[in-house]
Amino acid sequence: MALPYPEIRLKKGKEKSVLNFHPWIFSGALEKMPAQLNNGDTVTLLSHDGEILGTGLFHHSSIAVRLLAFSKVELNVTFWIQKLSNALQLRKNIHLFNNKETTAYRLVHGEGDGLSGLIIDIYGDCAVIQCHIKGMFRHRDIIAEALNNVFNQSINTIYDKSEDSFFENNESRFLKGEKQSEIIKENGHRFYVNWFEGQKTGFFIDQRENRRLLSNYCDSKNVINLFAYSGGFSIYALKSGAALVHSVDSSSRAENWANQNVQLNDAVNHQFFCEDVFTFLKETKNNYQLWVVDPPAFAKRLDAVRNSLLPGTTLRLIFFPPLLSTRPILHSSGILATSLRLGSGSIP
């Protein structure tokens, strides 16, 4: 869709967040919009008085518009090249680009790079994109073109890991090349990453600094990594002197990847338990000085969190009942490293 884009007008006084450069426009702030707008259409946002506030992607949802620019622009290849160039320059500034010890990094992190609804992860010479909204998905071909330009054609595979519902008419997920996996380095450790079959874009890149932080506390400890996936935290623990590491995950595919990562890093004293985490915790007789608990999203929405809470209980009781057991499988002076996403709002 080229200029001119359909126009959406805000209610009086609702432009304050936009003037403060917040990219989300909620549906309740809209006063007037064309009747035939479809999910993913590009729109020009106007104030109540008709002042141009920005250009964004429209959706019939609570977040009605996600702004990609705070001016009137055309979302052509020049726009995308500039956005991706800015993102790459930032990664160069923090020494992630052409880093021999870390060959995987997040190039685009949604709102943080001014591209709400888009994730792009780089694995060596491969790029995996993930569109979280239909409007971004509709730009995937031009995003791939811009990636090729910004990286001077050095990206050999571009894979689209967006949700299945966005794809129509047997569209290919491969926008360039056909590689399904890669062996990458992160802070000197080697990992097998499979974006074709794996979770998210193949590896939880956003946990890189947490993995490095964890390595400061593992020396000579017995470590358990729950919901271990491909063993990212386990490798860091092993290579920083842990006495032993147990990884637990119900996925046999994750078990294969984790064991492969152990071999890639010449690590020892590791055992993978392919079973339900809570069953394992009830049955294990081991004692651990350091727990890593990075579970899947049990409840992404606040109402789901409320429904998961029984009267008088806490998340600690629900997710980690063995911590309150009379059998101390977490050492009394042990460390619990956990990462939970609960969304926003208050929980009664």
Residue spans of the language-model regions?
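Non-catalytic accessory regions of SAM-dependent methyltransferases
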Residues: 1-122
